[in-house]
């Protein structure tokens, strides 16, 4: 008989106590709290309010087009236009139709921009709002077509136009057809300008690539939300090209303001009032 015979024990599931403790903990819905990317504070969703601004550091959370519409436009004043336009997948890019269908189902949007007319404190304007939840609001043929039609409508109806930009750039799945939208939208902006009409762009986080290099930079007045990322190429691409280290705040709205690329930085909570004032100041008054 072995002197040190191995004893047999009844094993208890080591995970059982952990599972029981987890079961006793109250379930907290994921949508109840949000973590601020800037100050890292955990914030009660209700404290963010409809403007989605961090109460600790004033960081502007990214919001959807519909959320922005509710903040800016007068209630029930928005009339959507140019819906139902669809991309035909000109390059037969594999998986693109399926990606579009899935994104439409998830977001409830037809495309990465909503277009139409609205009033802001009673001032009528054409309005376009890009939505970064739709394939990062990349600009494809449909986005370009909707924006062009809106500018043409505003030109015909002699309306000012406000465009909220948010984009990762041109949509790679549509290749050269996507890049063409830069020239197409810019030409529509020029015709609107030649008619003596007013155009405001509001640059939000992020506004990059072909959108920055076209209609986003052509506003008569260019506003931006605080700390928004605004640029063309990515930071690393530029540093590797020029072989220099860029400033920490490079491509931030504040940096662009200091260098004359942005006219003003406006807090989201003050944006509606600012836009209404600008529209009022640039509205032609008859019989004066």
From Swiss-Prot:
It is found in: Cytoplasm. GO terms for cellular component: acetyl-CoA carboxylase complex. It holds the Pfam family Zn_ribbon_ACC. Component of the acetyl coenzyme A carboxylase (ACC) complex. Biotin carboxylase (BC) catalyzes the carboxylation of biotin on its carrier protein (BCCP) and then the CO(2) group is transferred by the transcarboxylase to acetyl-CoA to form malonyl-CoA. Pathway: Lipid metabolism; malonyl-CoA biosynthesis; malonyl-CoA from acetyl-CoA: step 1/1. Belongs to the AccD/PCCB family. GO terms for biological process: fatty acid biosynthetic process; malonyl-CoA biosynthetic process. Keywords: ATP-binding, Cytoplasm, Fatty acid biosynthesis, Fatty acid metabolism, Lipid biosynthesis, Lipid metabolism, Metal-binding, Nucleotide-binding, Transferase, Zinc, Zinc-finger. It comes from the Bacteria. Acetyl-CoA carboxylase is a heterohexamer composed of biotin carboxyl carrier protein (AccB), biotin carboxylase (AccC) and two subunits each of ACCase subunit alpha (AccA) and ACCase subunit beta (AccD). It comes from Lactococcus lactis subsp. lactis (strain IL1403). The keyword Nucleotidyltransferase does not apply. It catalyses: N(6)-carboxybiotinyl-L-lysyl-[protein] + acetyl-CoA = N(6)-biotinyl-L-lysyl-[protein] + malonyl-CoA. One of its GO terms (molecular function) is zinc ion binding. Binds 1 zinc ion per subunit. This is Acetyl-coenzyme A carboxylase carboxyl transferase subunit beta. Its cofactor is Zn(2+).
């Amino acid at each position: 008989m072995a002197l040190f015979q191995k004893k047999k024990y009844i094993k208890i599931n080591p995970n059982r106590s952990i599972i029981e403790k987890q079961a006793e903990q109250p379930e907290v819905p994921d949508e109840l709290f949000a973590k601020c990317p800037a100050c890292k504070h955990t914030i009660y969703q209700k404290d963010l309010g409809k403007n989605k601004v961090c109460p600790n550091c004033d960081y502007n959370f990214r919001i959807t087009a519909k959320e922005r519409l509710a903040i800016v436009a007068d209630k029930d004043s928005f009339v959507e236009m140019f819906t139902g336009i669809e991309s035909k997948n000109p390059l037969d890019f594999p998986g693109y139709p399926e990606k579009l269908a899935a994104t439409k189902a998830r977001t409830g949007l037809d495309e990465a921009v909503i277009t139409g007319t609205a009033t802001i404190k009673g001032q009528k304007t054409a309005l376009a709002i890009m939505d970064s939840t739709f394939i990062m609001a990349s600009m494809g043929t449909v986005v370009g077509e909707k924006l062009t039609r809106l500018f043409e409508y505003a030109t015909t109806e002699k309306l000012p136009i406000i465009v909220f930009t948010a984009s990762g750039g041109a949509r790679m799945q549509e290749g050269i057809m996507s890049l063409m939208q830069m020239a197409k939208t810019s030409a529509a902006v020029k015709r609107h300008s030649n008619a003596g009409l007013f155009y405001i762009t509001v640059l939000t986080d992020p506004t990059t690539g072909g959108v920055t290099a076209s209609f986003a930079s052509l506003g008569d007045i260019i506003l931006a939300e605080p700390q928004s990322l605004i640029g063309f190429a990515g930071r690393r691409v530029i540093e590797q090209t020029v072989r220099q280290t860029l400033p920490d705040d490079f491509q931030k709205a504040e940096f662009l303001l200091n260098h004359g690329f942005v006219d003003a930085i406006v807090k989201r909570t003050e944006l509606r009032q600012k836009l209404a004032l600008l529209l009022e100041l640039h509205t032609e008054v008859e019989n004066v």
